[in-house]
């Protein structure tokens, strides 16, 4: 009886066949050996053909399988099966998706923070509480770094900068309006003034231009003159559109309400008028000042602020409510006014003082007397009167100009509780008008008396500092 140890339950048919062939060959070899050894007296022992067959077959299977297994191991070491390649590519794809999602999440977080910051600024701006602190980074300019634009024949009285900061409009006592290119300093267009008595046939002003303003979208330019007229122009082409009449005295102040085409005007007739430029229509008139109005300004709210000259008052006009708030503070004539934001404003007077106001306080928050120094003999000194003021909106930086031929820059204290001098810029002539650009990158001055200049003081921010260039 054969042992089960040699019985193979599952055998490769090919190997079994090969084993049989091997056994047959061995039997033949054994038979031949027997024949050749027939001469010998001792016969050779005949091995069991059955066991030889089983052992031979099993040995043959192992010997043939080992090289194949070793080859298979080599293949696994150096080659990659399609399944493994798919798995590897899938893992790479998942890693890529993970990295993209993480980057997207970071970008979304940054954008969310940026949007939140902008929304917060907009809310503070609407409330009039936004104050960007940039005054500490502003450095005084060198004289060689100030650009001068020449073109008017008589002293410049007013100027504005377009909302995109690409152009400047200036007007003068020669009744002309010039549009300048900021980058090149060249004239883009000139609206010539006419002679007195040619009002019916001349398109433009025939009297000294006292004030001007531009809408926040840059569409309309408005100018006012000594002839009680308000002219409306298309800012892009300088084409004349409308002529507003109604004031009984020279038009001394103009301002568009931000985001609209509602126009506020002030006059020496002591009134404030409201116009709708889109409709080419007059809206209403407001009274209150006891002397000529010397300046006017407005922002987004449906209200405007005015300086009352010799009545020594500043007034806040609430148009919708048809009411006004009256503020007192200066000892002399208040000649200029500018809003810093919806809650705070700055004024200048002929007593040489510059004052900082809140619309919620009837008295100035801060006043600097003799802001531009004094002139005259000892014991008879008189302060240099302040002819113009400007404010970089929603910041802590303001400027004032005087007939002492200097521009003074000021830093507003925390929550607008004080005024600190930064530096002065000497020029030649009366500083009749000052304007900061919308971006805050440059300041423009309109100079009168003998020079009749538009002067650009531009500055750039680099490594945390600001310098006029």
Where do the model's predicted regions map?
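WD40/WD-repeat beta-propeller blade N-cap
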Residues: 149-156, 193-209, 245-251, 287-293, ...
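Loop/turn segments within WD40 beta-propeller blades
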Residues: 160-165, 171, 212-218, 224, ...
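Structural hallmark of WD40 beta-propellers
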Residues: 166-169, 218-222, 231, 240-242, ...
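Conserved strand-to-loop turn within each blade of WD40 beta-propeller repeats
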Residues: 171-174, 224-227, 266-269, 307-311, ...
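Blade-level signature of beta-propeller repeat domains, shared across WD40, Kelch, NHL, RCC1
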Residues: 437-469
